Amino acid sequence: MENTILHIHSFQLPQTEQPYPEAMLFDRDTSDSRTVLTQKPNGLEISLNFLQYDGHKGLFIRQDSRTNEPEYIEPKVLKPRNSYILFRNATSRCSQSIDPNSAFVSRVSSYIWGSGIPNPIVRRWFKYMGFFEALYHEVDYPEYIPNKLPKSPKKPKVQKGATKSKKKGAKGKNKVTALQVLVGPTVGVGGRMTVSPMTAFFSNNSHVTCYDPNFVLDTPTREFLMMPLDDITLPSQGPRSDSQEQHVPRQPPDGQDYFDILDIDDFVSPYDDLTTRSFTNRQLFKHATLG
């Protein structure tokens, strides 16, 4: 499963001036298309449709192949905190999605291993973020699911005159991170995980960083800012305090709606007033939240 991108979504999006369905995802290949997730009658699978979206009417547009006339479709809003795992092959454009609340979870393990992402890491993160209990009954190796993320390993003491070991890949070896994401000129595996409104995680097994859940991984080779897992703060639930400083992110370069290489100042707190602000699919957020 090369060139596979793993998406885990909670579908909690902010209120905007225009209707903004919770089930809407951005398709990274066409600027005016959206990936709509609709639940099948059996409640176990999700189907994918690529449709245009009319922001003024709040409806999706599907072109009728027989009459060539547009058909307006009202989006199905999924329940808050519903989470779905979507495996997408970037080469063949084929997609498969699985509801972790169903028995299909057992299949997820093989897909995760096949894409080079160690499933115990994903399971730990699911457990830590408090997702549905049904998920844990379906996975293999329940001993891999701790109640919380383990502490980072202590740094070994170095005696005077001794030289530190510089083994490649040793950094962050024992850390538990959201997903293993490999970004580089020859690597085609990417990942994204949303665990709460306006929060997403990327990880390369030793670092993790947060993005808006609408943010799309444009190419597997794009360079992203990575922050150590210890630098990610998990604030307690609740609204942002008025005494806290309001952070205003800088804007990307003229003519771009994204940053080529991200800077720490490109992140804002999710505790800004999400009900009155309008967000784009390129805005980023600094802190993880338990949602």
Curated annotation (Swiss-Prot):
GO terms for molecular function: DNA binding. The keyword Kinase does not apply. It is found in: Nucleus. Keywords: Activator, DNA-binding, Nucleus, Transcription, Transcription regulation. Residues 148-173, 232-255 are annotated as: Disordered. The keyword Transcription applies. GO terms for cellular component: nucleus. Signal peptide: none annotated. Residues 73-144 bind DNA. Its main location: nucleus. Residues 151-173 have a biased composition (Basic residues). Mating type proteins are sequence specific DNA-binding proteins that act as master switches in yeast differentiation by controlling gene expression in a cell type-specific fashion. Transcriptional activator that induces the transcription of A cell-specific genes. Required for repression of conjugation in diploid cells. Belongs to the MATA2 family. This is Mating-type protein A2. It comes from Yarrowia lipolytica (Candida lipolytica).
